[in-house]
UniProtKB/Swiss-Prot annotation:
Gene from which this protein is expressed: leuD
Pfam family, one: Aconitase_C
Complex and partners: Heterodimer of LeuC and LeuD.
Protein name per its UniProtKB record: 3-isopropylmalate dehydratase small subunit
Entry-linked PANTHER family: 3-ISOPROPYLMALATE DEHYDRATASE SMALL SUBUNIT (PTHR43345:SF5), 3-ISOPROPYLMALATE DEHYDRATASE SMALL SUBUNIT 2-RELATED-RELATED (PTHR43345)
Catalytic activity, as annotated: (2R,3S)-3-isopropylmalate = (2S)-2-isopropylmalate
Length: 212
């Protein structure tokens, strides 16, 4: 994973509550476990006017002109602003894969489904919980050109008007995002200790390593 740095970005306002993982990435795309290449199919049923299929070339598909992700003013945005219970439904990890592959690094919402929330941290996305009144205010301001600054180190979201909102994040998850560590990377931080344990184990219980 890429280390999570402080950044400023335009904000995509997805003004829908209870967005489930099937809306984020429909079930027909779950056959692949490549972890990459899902960005073009993010919000597929809302984003396009036809039905998407795995490995389909999306460059010529008819776009839904009313869907917020298709509006040119939000192109390149890395922050998604959402409503409560974002990521509900099935536990598919493809949902954060698609969001990350599209380019989102942070999602702001009043609440998230638990499994989706956990999966975001494992895939380089920062899910930020702000109270509903604050999210309402951000939606009222999130027109074309509106930007926010996300600073994980200080655990703050800042507006262009000088307002700053603090968010909570578990210390271990913060460490992982700041250092770009997935589960494998976190384990490799203890590589020397693991090798030392294996070497000691071979001496104390050599029969476990005997080759027939």
């Amino acid at each position: 994973m890429k280390p999570f740095k402080k950044f400023t970005s335009r904000v995509v306002p997805l003004d829908r509550a209870n967005v489930d993982t099937d809306a984020i990435i429909p079930k027909q795309f779950l056959k692949s476990i490549r972890r990459s290449g899902f960005g073009p199919y993010l919000f597929d049923e809302w984003r396009y006017l036809d039905r998407g299929e795995p490995d389909m070339d999306c460059s010529h598909r008819p776009l839904n002109p009313e869907f917020v992700l298709n509006l040119p003013c939000y192109a390149g945005a890395r922050i998604l602003l959402a409503r409560k219970n974002f990521g509900c439904g099935s536990s598919r990890e493809h949902a954060p894969w698609a969001l990350e592959d599209y380019g989102f690094r942070a999602i702001i919402a009043p609440s998230f489904a638990d499994i989706f929330y956990n999966n975001c941290f494992k895939n380089g996305i920062l899910p930020i919980v702000l109270d509903e009144a604050t999210v309402d205010r951000l939606f009222s301001e999130a027109g074309p050109g509106f930007e926010l600054t996300v600073d994980l180190e200080s655990q703050t979201v800042a507006t262009p008007f000088g307002e700053t909102f603090h968010f909570d994040v578990d210390a271990s998850r913060k460490h992982r995002l700041l250092n770009g560590l997935d589960d494998i990377g976190l384990t490799l931080q203890h590589a020397d200790a693991i090798r030392a344990y294996e070497a000691a184990r071979r001496k104390s219980a050599p029969w476990l390593f005997a080759v027939p």
